[in-house]
Each structure stands twice: as C-alpha cells, then as structure tokens.
C-alpha cells in the first residue's frame, strides 16, 4: 500500500480544524508584540473572563448543591429529621436498660467458669468446717505407692515430698496412704508371726529412716486418718 494513502488520511483529519483559523492572519517570522490576532482575540477574551469565575468562591459553581437540587440551604441542617432522635435517646436507652442492657447473673457466670476450672488437691479448703471425703487414687498413683511401700514402709520427709511432687499429691495424702497401707499390711500378716510382721517382702528399712518417719507421724497424730483404701 502506497504512502500516499496515509498522507491523505492524515490530511483529512486536520482539514476540519482548519476552519477554526479562517480569520487568522498569515504567519510570519516577525510580527508586532502588541498586535492582536483577529482569530484569537475573541477566544482570549472569553477565556480571560471565564477563568476568574472558576476560582471565585462566590461563583455559582461553588454553591451548595442542596440549595438548588434539594431545597436545603446552609441553615437547613439544624432542621434535619435527625434532630428529633436526640429527644428520643433517653427513652430508647431506658428501654434497652430494662432488656438487653441488664447485667447477667453473676452466679451463672461464676458457675460456668468453675465448670471449666480444674481444682487441684492443694487448692481445696482445709478448714475445720470442711467435710472430708475419701481420697481416690489413679491406677498409676496406686502402683507407684505400692512399689514404694514394697521397699520402704516408712518414708522420710524428703522422700515424701519427692513422691508428692511426682504423683501430683500432697504430703498429707502420701502420709495417710502409707498409714492405711501399714495397717492393712499388719492385718494381713497378723497370724504369720512376728518375723513376717517385721517387714514386707524386700529390704528392711533402716533405723534412721524408721525413726524419722515415726517422729513425723507423731507430730501429725492429731490428724484424722481416712478409711482404708480397698
């Protein structure tokens, strides 16, 4: 395709705009600085007259659209329907206070919290008015206590603390379990003679350990022993 097609196409685009400059004087390299062209004179004056209006605050373009479109002036905002809600707010809040704004029962909240709260043995009350219940031991705790009792019928204070921490029990629970276990063992070996009743199967406890355990038991004689565990 020849290049003349593009030239004719471009020329046809600018021919329509050439009519805008029909009144313009022929251009030249030298023209008077103060001369006013007839083709641009009217347009320049119109542009100069419209530009101040665009940036004039008092221009109709800057007027509030509510004044013409919605019939609301600058002072009409105080008469909006929202003002009527201010008078009804106390009534609405009073109605909400009777219903959803009421505080829930504190007992119900504490009951739900206590249901999901795990109580450990050391957290229970130990006052004189507390009703003592029978302590239940897990199979793991019972097995470990039986293993310890097999080697030592009496525990020292240090060993009792170690077992209490290992089995998540209190020292008093360990002490009572060993007391009940010794009573049960004595009943089982009552008719077997003094030799069998001296010590269980295994090593005989040392004299120091026995004396320390007996002293600890004497200090806690005022505590009530629980029922023998089956």
Swiss-Prot record:
Residues 130-189 bind DNA. Signal peptide: none annotated. GO terms for biological process: angiogenesis; anterior/posterior pattern specification; embryonic skeletal system morphogenesis; negative regulation of cell-matrix adhesion; negative regulation of DNA-templated transcription; negative regulation of keratinocyte differentiation; negative regulation of leukocyte migration; negative regulation of monocyte differentiation. Residues 194-213 have a biased composition (Low complexity). One of its GO terms (cellular component) is nucleus. Belongs to the Antp homeobox family. It comes from the Eukaryota. This is Homeobox protein Hox-A7. Pfam families: Homeodomain. Sequence-specific transcription factor which is part of a developmental regulatory system that provides cells with specific positional identities on the anterior-posterior axis.
């Amino acid at each position: 395709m020849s290049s003349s097609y593009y030239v004719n196409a471009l020329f046809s685009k600018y021919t329509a705009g050439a009519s805008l400059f029909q009144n313009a004087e022929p251009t030249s390299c030298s023209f008077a600085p103060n001369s006013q062209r007839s083709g641009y004179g009217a347009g320049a004056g119109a542009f100069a007259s419209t530009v101040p209006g665009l940036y004039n605050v008092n221009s109709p373009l800057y007027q509030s659209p509510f004044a013409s479109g919605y019939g609301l002036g600058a002072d009409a905002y105080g008469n909006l329907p929202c003002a009527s809600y201010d008078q009804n707010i106390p009534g609405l809040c009073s109605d909400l206070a009777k219903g959803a704004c009421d505080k829930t029962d504190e007992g119900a909240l504490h009951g739900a919290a206590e249901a999901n709260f795990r109580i450990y043995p050391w957290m229970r009350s130990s006052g004189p008015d507390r009703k003592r219940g029978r302590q239940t031991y897990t199979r793991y705790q019972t097995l470990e206590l039986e293993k310890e009792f097999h080697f030592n019928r009496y525990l020292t204070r240090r060993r009792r603390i170690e077992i209490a921490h290992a089995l998540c029990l209190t020292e008093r629970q360990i002490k009572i379990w060993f007391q009940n276990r010794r009573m049960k063992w004595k009943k089982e070996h009552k008719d077997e003679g003094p030799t069998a009743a001296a010590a269980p199967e295994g090593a005989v406890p040392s004299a120091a350990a026995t004396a320390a355990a007996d002293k600890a038991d004497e200090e806690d004689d005022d505590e009530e022993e629980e029922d023998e565990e089956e």
